[in-house]
């Protein structure tokens, strides 16, 4: 069997859903499990409606609710011009009623808990999958019966052993030649049956977990680009699809801002040894990227990525000199405040680290000031150079920084696996940095014409 995951842009309207149905029909001999996101913009609309309700503006929240349901009924009406199947019509009515009750509850309490937000957010995937399942005439499975998670609403962690057992019991019997099964990405439920979500972009993660649990031959991520590109095409129009990526390269790119894959997607596939392919819904037989355990591209640099804004914290203390355990104490403070660190660079008496720009720093800084002084640089961007051959190619880092000679690099960090060289620049310099580096990657030439 295979897993076919389609993102929001791939199920945005009736035309897109027909294209998805055609792709699934072509893959029926491979017993596809179809995993869908909400239709484009739906999750954002649900979040906005929830915030309006929390603010006490129930009228605005319900107006967004009506617009959302009307849009989905319009899509369904285009797909079924002679009338909606009774099961689909009933499902849309039920989901509309559920959303209405949830929004009214939030407005009444003027409180939007993560638990309530997850319940509201789940409506999007349940709407899109109901319509596509009806279009395909396929069984519809509520992912919440299979995707068992912990209680961390908004960013729930799947309980992989339970997911595997539930998938084997509830999904596998439905799979068979010439039949698809439709379920949702992004959503799950805890042990008490309360709805959870895996965080924004979590549909990819769902697809990988389902694929690993069922021993899929291939996990296909269908999106609106021809695979993973060498760089963000909005920044570098010359960016090209990458035919093959290693699991390690893909994980680094996802972690450092490549938008095609959710960062957590790769691990279940790695553990199960299942290739992941990233394909274009509108160009199904065009170029695509295969992500596998081993690849042999021969390129010193495979791709570039960036992530920002981030904040750089420089922690300085004379206690670092000749003292063991300083870094352990430092990171214990970050752990206590549940703040993740992306990059780290050390000197004799200082450590520079990057954290997300929206990380809550006030209490962290108060604790750090007990044993160090802390400098803060905001509005920075991490630029990452990723490639399996990076560590094996003499001089490539020199050529990269030669390309950046007109850009001030504030921090440098080499990944422990030596396939990721990252550096920090001011946010306004990130675009120029990527555009300067891409010719080194794409043509194998530095800006002055020298060969790597």
Language-model features: locations:
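A conserved regulatory-domain signal marking ACT and ACT-like small-molecule sensing domains
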Residues: 285-452
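Short, mixed-charge, low-aromatic patches
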Residues: 3, 85-94, 126, 162-166, ...
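Acidic carboxylate-rich catalytic motifs and surrounding loops in phosphoryl-/glycosyl-chemistry enzymes
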Residues: 144, 279-282
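Structural motif
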Residues: 1-2, 31-34, 73, 138-139, ...
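Nucleotide/pyrophosphate-binding catalytic subdomain
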Residues: 1-262, 266, 424-426, 445, ...
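Acidic/polar loop patches that form or flank catalytic/metal-binding clefts of enzymes
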Residues: 262, 273-280
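Positions that flank functional sites
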Residues: 146-148, 226-228, 284, 349, ...
């Amino acid at each position: 069997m295979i897993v076919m995951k389609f993102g929001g842009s791939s199920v945005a309207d009736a035309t897109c859903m027909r294209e998805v149905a055609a792709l699934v029909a072509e893959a029926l001999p491979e017993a596809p499990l179809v995993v869908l996101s909400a239709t484009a913009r739906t999750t954002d609309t649900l979040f906005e409606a929830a915030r309006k309700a929390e603010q006490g503006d129930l009228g605005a929240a319900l107006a967004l609710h009506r617009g959302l349901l009307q849009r989905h009924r319009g899509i369904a009406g285009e797909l079924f011009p002679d009338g909606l199947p009774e099961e689909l019509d009933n499902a849309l009515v039920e989901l509309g009623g559920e959303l209405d009750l949830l929004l009214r509850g939030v407005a009444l309490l003027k409180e939007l808990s993560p638990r309530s937000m997850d319940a509201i957010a789940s409506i999007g995937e349940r709407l899109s999958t109901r319509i596509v399942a009806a279009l395909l005439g396929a069984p519809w499975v509520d992912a919440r019966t299979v995707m068992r998670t912990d209680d961390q609403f908004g960013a729930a962690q799947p309980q992989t052993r339970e997911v595997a057992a539930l998938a084997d019991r509830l999904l596998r019997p439905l799979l068979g030649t010439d039949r698809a099964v439709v379920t949702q990405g992004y959503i799950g439920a805890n042990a008490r049956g309360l709805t959870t979500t895996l965080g924004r972009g979590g549909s990819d993660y769902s697809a990988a977990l389902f694929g690993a649990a069922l021993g899929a031959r291939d996990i296909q991520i269908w999106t609106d680009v021809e695979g993973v590109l060498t760089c963000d095409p909005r920044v570098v129009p010359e960016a090209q699809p990458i035919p093959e990526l290693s699991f390690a390269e893909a994980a680094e790119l996802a972690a450092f801002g490549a938008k095609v894959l959710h960062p957590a997607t790769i691990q279940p596939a790695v553990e199960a040894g299942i290739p992941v392919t990233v394909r274009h819904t509108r160009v199904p037989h065009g170029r695509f990227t295969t992500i596998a355990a081993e690849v042999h591209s021969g390129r010193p640099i495979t791709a570039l990525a960036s992530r920002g804004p981030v904040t750089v914290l420089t922690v300085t203390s004379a206690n670092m000199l000749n003292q063991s355990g300083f870094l352990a104490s430092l990171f214990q403070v970050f752990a206590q405040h549940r703040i993740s660190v992306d990059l780290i660079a050390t000197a004799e008496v200082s450590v520079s680290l990057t954290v997300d720009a929206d990380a809550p720093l006030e209490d962290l800084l108060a604790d750090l000031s007990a044993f160090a002084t802390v400098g803060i640089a905001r509005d920075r961007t991490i630029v990452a150079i990723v490639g399996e051959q990076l560590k094996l190619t003499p001089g490539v880092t020199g050529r990269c920084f030669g390309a950046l000679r007109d850009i001030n690099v504030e921090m440098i960090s080499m990944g422990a696996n030596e396939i990721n060289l990252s550096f920090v620049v001011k946010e306004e310099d990130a675009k120029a940095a990527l555009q300067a580096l891409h010719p080194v990657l794409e043509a194998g030439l530095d800006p002055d014409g020298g060969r790597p």
